[in-house]
Amino acid sequence: RTAVSSSDLKKVTGQKPSGAMRIKAGATDFDPDYYVNFEEIGTKHPIFRCWHISEDYFLLQLYKKGAEDMINGGTSADVSELAVFKAEDQTIMPVTGLPADGKFGGEPYGEKGYAYMAVTVTTGEKPAFYKIDAKTGKAVKGLTVEADAITTVGKMEYLSK
């Protein structure tokens, strides 16, 4: 499926399901023996976004109500579901431990087998960072921020000369 945008419209077109292909190290073409249809495994929901965590683990942000909501919902489609994809095993594991009304910041940060995601809730609580274990899919609440929302998370590192 392809997303098309204009200043007042965002709509998904096409019929292909969300999926993954790979290019093996040193190759220049897609591996013809590797294709994963995300809409046939895990929660069977299409992908909104995908980020590398570590090794062959990827954090997926999914359309929680499935393909129909993705196609008809436009910018109001529910994208509040996270899952971990393990590429070698071709498995998807839902992330647990997140608030039910969580909305996610733009970019997570991945390091040493964990993804760190900014989460804002609608219940009046302050936003917080959640640490997601790539191998278990378990999210644990970390630092709470005195703000209305958090848009992203990252790491700054001082490089000495």
Q: Which role does the model predict for each range below?
A:
Residues 40-53, 100-110, 145-159:
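Repeated scaffold domains used in trafficking and secretory/extracellular systems
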Residues 4-9, 64-70, 121-125, 160:
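Short glycine/acidic-enriched loop and turn motifs that connect beta-strands
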Residues 13-28, 75-89, 129-137:
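Beta-propeller blade signature
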Residues 1-58, 62-65:
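Acidic, serine/threonine- and glycine-rich low-complexity intrinsically disordered segments
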Residues 1, 24-27, 52-58, 107-115, ...:
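Short, solvent-exposed coil/turn segments at beta-strand boundaries
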Residues 30-41, 91-99, 140-146:
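Beta-propeller fold detector
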Residues 127-129, 133-161:
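TerminUS-proximal long segments
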Residues 82-122:
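C-terminal hydrophobic structural anchor segments
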